[in-house]
């Protein structure tokens, strides 16, 4: 690998992560922890999840469920879960979480979400840790007759352009994806030049209220 590339930016789920970690190359990671000496560029996942959970509570939700994907290399889902638990505790509300593995087949993931509605028919708020899951949950909820946002409010996380184009009404936490990528490139260039680079860079996020959250009165 070292004879083919000069440096690596790792930003997606990849089965070769272990190989990358041991490559004798400058590496920068986006939103995932690989090794203590590898710089990470991330959005403020804790603050974003706090913002999402509080947005649901401010709009009257009392039975909120958090769905997130487990992956050992992704610190962001863990930060989002921690924030969700903390905010729910602060408001003395029950914190319910549904987890799925990152490599969970789509049919199995859908079945898991169907069980969510079966087991918690009174759910009135869902915070999904990614927009794809939020869109899937929105579709399932509507198929079951939930009126969104009158009966059920949903918010995702990512704000990727593709999802916003496909599901423009979805409320979500928007990550500064372009800024993260630009900064990761700068960090990699600095590492390749032998310059000092911070081990962690955290960028702020924003809330897009969309149409799956109620309007605050």
Feature-to-residue mapping (PLM):
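Glycine-rich phosphate/diphosphate-binding loops that line cofactor/substrate pockets in enzymes
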Residues: 53-64
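Flexible loop/turn connectors
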Residues: 96, 114-217
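Alpha-helical recognition/docking segments in bacterial nutrient-uptake
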Residues: 1-54, 118, 122
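Short acidic/polar active-site loop segments enriched in Thr and Asp
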Residues: 6, 61-63, 124
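Hinge/beta->alpha junction and helix N-cap segments in small-molecule ligand-binding domains
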Residues: 14, 41-51, 67-112, 127-135, ...
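Generic beta-sheet signal
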Residues: 11, 30-32, 43, 67, ...
């Amino acid at each position: 690998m070292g004879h083919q590339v000069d440096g690596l930016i790792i930003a997606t789920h990849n089965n070769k992560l272990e190989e990358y970690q041991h490559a004798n190359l400058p590496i920068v990671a986006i939103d995932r922890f690989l090794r203590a000496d590898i710089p990470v560029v991330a959005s403020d996942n804790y603050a974003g999840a706090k913002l999402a959970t509080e947005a649901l509570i401010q709009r009257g939700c009392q039975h909120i469920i958090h769905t997130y994907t487990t992956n050992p290399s992704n610190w962001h889902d863990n930060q989002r879960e921690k924030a969700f638990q903390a905010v729910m505790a602060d408001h003395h509300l029950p914190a319910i979480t549904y987890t799925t593995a990152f490599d969970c087949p789509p049919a199995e993931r859908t079945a898991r979400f169907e069980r969510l509605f079966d087991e918690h028919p009174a759910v009135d708020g869902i915070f999904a840790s990614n927009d794809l899951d939020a869109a899937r949950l929105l579709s399932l909820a509507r198929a079951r007759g939930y009126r969104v946002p009158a009966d059920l409010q949903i918010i995702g996380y990512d704000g990727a352009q593709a999802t916003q184009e496909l599901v423009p009404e979805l409320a979500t936490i928007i990550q500064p994806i372009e800024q993260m990528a630009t900064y990761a490139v700068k960090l990699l260039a600095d590492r390749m030049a032998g310059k000092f680079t911070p081990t962690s860079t955290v960028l702020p996020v924003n809330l897009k209220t969309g149409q799956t959250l109620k309007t605050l009165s």
